[in-house]
Amino acid sequence: MGSDLVSIIMPSYNCGKYVEETIHSVLAQTYQNWEIIFMDDCSTDDTIKKVSALRDKDNRIHVYQNIANLGAAVSRNNALREARGRWIAFLDSDDLWESTKLEKQIRFMEENEYFFSYTDYQEIDNESKAKGVFISGPEHITKQGMYNFCWPGCLTVMYDASKIGLIQIEDIKKNNDYAMWLKICKKADCYLLDECLARYRRGRAGSVSSHSITTMIRWHYKLWHDAEGKGALSSLWLTGMNLIYGFYKKQKYVKKAEK
């Protein structure tokens, strides 16, 4: 396996409660050639203070701050422009990785000559306790498959920037990770490493998982209409497909551990 640099894109807003735990999950990786591109969106809590203290101990952590509160899409775009690595990975500042995540995913991609991949993950609560919910997805996602639904969890995705290039997305407030996968899937199919290598914090105030279905429908429509430039009817159709495949995903790929 090679030893190319991994750039970890970490946007943040008011995650002071969790950010140290998140970064420690990166520090614990068995694959150590990485950099964190930490992009703070003008947090009003102690996020910057905590991350700066960690940066002072490890120069692989690069801390940036937007000039104003600009949202996750702009934060990811800004962070990606600072990335130097061949491999691009994503980790929000309240989620966690298992210690072998980078090593196993890079090996999976190199051995199979994949340029875009994701892994299984599990849900945790606000106290980092496992909820017993595990999420997987299709083994192979084509461009059309990605149009059907946003299968990958953002915290599990990795792509090869030497093949894909710099990705920049439209300034939409939600579903900006989905907008990114749609752009990447126009250049490379996405493949699943069928192993649980990440932990997603579900239900934090302000997170997507805490919003109503009506709100999420509106976000999906804006994704297709504003970010992908589809007409009104096409945007409605694709939003409907997202709803159908979202139900399908819950039935097929979301599993609850037996108590």
Give the label of every model feature segment:
Residues N66-A83, K104:
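Glycine-rich, basic loop-to-helix element that forms the pyrophosphate-binding segment
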Residues I88:
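Short aromatic/hydrophobic "clamp" motif used to bind/position activated sugar donors
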Residues R81, G137-T215, W219-H220:
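Conserved nucleotide-sugar donor-binding catalytic segment
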Residues T100-K131:
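Conserved donor NDP-sugar-binding/catalytic core segment of glycosyltransferases
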Residues K17-E20, D45-A53, L96, T100:
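Acidic helix N-cap motif at the loop->helix transition within catalytic regions
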Residues N14-A28:
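Short, well-formed alpha-helical segments that are part of the catalytic scaffolds
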Residues D4-S7, S25, E35, A179:
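Cell-envelope/extracellular polymer assembly enzymes that use nucleotide-activated donors
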Residues S25, Q32, D40-K49, A68, ...:
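A conserved acidic beta->alpha catalytic loop
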